[in-house]
Amino acid sequence: MKRIALLGATGSIGRQTLEIVEEHPELELVAAASGSRPIDGLAPLTQVGGDLTELLERAEPDVVLNAVVGFAGLPATFWALERGVDLALANKESLVAGGDLAVAAWERGGGRLLPVDSEHSAAHQLLEGRARETVHSLVLTASGGPFRGRRRADLADVRPAEALAHPTWSMGPKITVDSATLMNKGLELIEAHFLFALPYETIEVVVHPSSVVHALVRLRDGASLAHLGHPDMRVPISYALTYPERSATPIEALDLGAGLILEFGAPDGEAFPCLSLARAAGESGGTAPCVLNAANEVAVAAFLDGELPFLGIADVVERTLAQIDCPPARDLEELVAMDAEARRTASALTRQLVH
């Protein structure tokens, strides 16, 4: 029996996790937390808001599934990593912002870090047990979001409702907007660097509208290995919770005889500059990914509130990065301080852009 603590229980990932737990008697939900919605009776221990690490201390879980949105998930990620508790990570922002500090905590703790992002779950399966010297590169796929194929000029008047209409995935509002700007893929690029210890120049991104191929690994002999499956988050959630076993899910295998078409293309960097901004921040190192993430969270929230135009998201992120020095953080306290500084700067820049 695995004891599961679910953080972010009322979001998209949280709800799908509950489905998986209900279907697997070997999984026991011992604790659940949400940001603001009531969850009384969902688990023996529940919490709304507050310090999630206190809940984790009381719950003593075998696995923490962190589906908190944004930087707020950072303390829970570090709690699990430092204690060697298996971490099923949907909160990519905590690894992006935590960077080298998170990796060091993971190495000290010695537990498993199992990504819940579909692309990184696929990459984990493709890379596991494979000697890194045999790997040429990792390819992450992006659906292209709801605005795939549009030019930059076509995006000036995009409204939040349009950005939230994702063509293939069912996700929460923040990650759906990130998908529309391609920032989500930028964050995933940085996440892949830290998860798999791959240099940035060996991580590629391609647009794949059907979201059937989740990741590919190119090998040095010229061969490529791909992970295919329906775009359904219950598959990577189940994989992370039941690892190293592989349990059944209600998701059917692909019907390869049904005229499956696999289309790939290059991202449009002019229309969607967030991907390039993320790559540059990752390559810069230090706390640049933390600043990138904080500025993006501020800008996306302003866009969803109708205060910032869609194209302003990338502008706020770029200007925030240009205004802040990003030295490496020596500890979690410095990381939190850098996040706060980036949010103040991004908020001020947002006000300037809309007035």
Where are these regions (language model features)?
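Catalytic, metal-anchored helix/loop core of enzyme active sites in primary metabolism
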Residues: 1-42, 47-355
